[in-house]
Amino acid sequence: TTLFRSDHALKAQDAFEKELIAYNRQIVEEGNKKQKLIILLAGRPYHSDPLVQHKISNMISAMGVYVITDDIVRHQDIPLKEVNFLAQWAFTNRILKSAKWAAQQGNHVQYMQLTSFGCGPDAFLIDEIRTLLKQYNKNLTLLKIDDVSNTGSIKLRVRSLVESLHISLQQAEERQVQKPLSLPLFTKKDRKKKIIAPFFTPFISPLIPSIFKVAGYEMETLPISDECSCDWGLKYSNNEVCYPATLIVGDIVKAFKEGRYDPDNTCVAITQTGGQCRASNYISLIKKALIENGYTHTPILSIAFGSGIDNQQPGFKVNWLKVLPIALAAVLYSDCIAKFYYAAVVREKKPGQAAKLKDMYLEAAKPLILKNRPEDLLSYLSLAVDEFNQICQQKSCPKVGVVGEIFLKFNPFAQKDITTWLIDRGIEVIPPLMTDFFMQSFVNMKVNQDSHIKKKYIPDFAIDWLYGKVQKQIDKINKIGKAFLHFQPFENIYEKAEKAKQVISLNTQFGEGWLIAGEMSSFASQGINHVISLQPFGCIANHIVEKGIEKRIKSVYPQINILSLDFDSSVSDVNITNRLLLFVDNIK
């Protein structure tokens, strides 16, 4: 039977792993006995292939060095409390544990790691390993390998390393373990401190401080990123990490470097959604940057919307029953203002009218949020409908939908403000919505439970009841918004999910998950056939759920025209503009 075969396979796998562990331990015992140099060669599972790793392990052993792998720590309980890293990938956890194991051994045991260019979590994993080894006065040797056939430089590095290690063994000095630096926890006494948070979007970011005030905290949103943010971010985060992380780290470091905030009386907040995306480790990157700059008295708050996020903050307490209704209303309100603004700005009778109304209504929302009056926000939307109608000319405009990674598609600086570029050419931008990002959770919960990926700890009727409460508010917004002449209503998230199912499995929930497919399908079904997808360069998750679905989505919607743009801190303005010009030529 299948069950018997699975059980047999698992037992065989377990026996194989035990054999690997035993063989590695045997090599270590022999090396220890002879006090010979031992190198722990760590890497991805595929680096065990001699072809992929260019026989580096053979090369090292031919020099009289004992070579072991990270399998030495399999099934060992090695705590990683001092590491700023979200332990959610099995192989990265093993690599970290092997680095700590090697660090704790004598000087004759050294650590070497193989990495392939652009390999996901390595962007922050390598920094953590380097810091970990440094605490034990050991160095990280990192070999970047790819498919090149010329391995001369690698051989030279390996030979040089082995020779230098042999020399250092003869001059071995007593090592002193350094105590790892860490940031304090957010405790009850920190509740009165000012909290700063990175800028996200021109629509919801201005309202976040008011929402936090309702929760009992004083928060300020940092200014939108600039070139200075890029410079600080590149200096204090790994240059191969995704672009949003560079900007977020840079914004926070810049705020303290410019003296706008006292690090001893300030806390940093960052939202986290969990999941396989590298964004789950943003909090670790921020902690590392603060420690490197000496801001060791600044606690970090994780505002988590997903599971698997572990950040101890015993003093952070929120009455969510009090805050969630006004927070939901604020998100819907800001999304609705975004719909009004983007439809009106290409039709405004006088330049600047739409921007003026947008700013006015976002500012008007702040006192209503402070008073915790969600219904009053709806009343203001009714007023906004009339005013946005008055500034619009009656004309038809070509439309472009914007999708992509959440930070890129919402943040003007990160995307080089391409929405304004399109508006200046008379193209109506159909904006991304925060509402959909949160509403997809209802679909994901049901899909995960029905697929037996997660246990059914929430009954369907409870999910449906909560969804109904939220959908009721969305229906109210749609009812008010339809009075605006160019309003496109909020779509039912389950209907969007059904469209996405034609393209991709709803179990695909990493990165933006199935939402990109759903948004593209929704645009195409509404006759919006031109879509721009914005991604950070090297964003593995979104490359799969966006670029990976293009062929399929074009087979379902042959008329759709997709432009994928990748961004990082060094992307060429000219390259982006040229691609946009070619894209626009197909619209008009």
Language-model regions, residue ranges each:
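An N-terminal assembly and electron-transfer interface module characteristic of large anaerobic redox
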Residues: 1-588
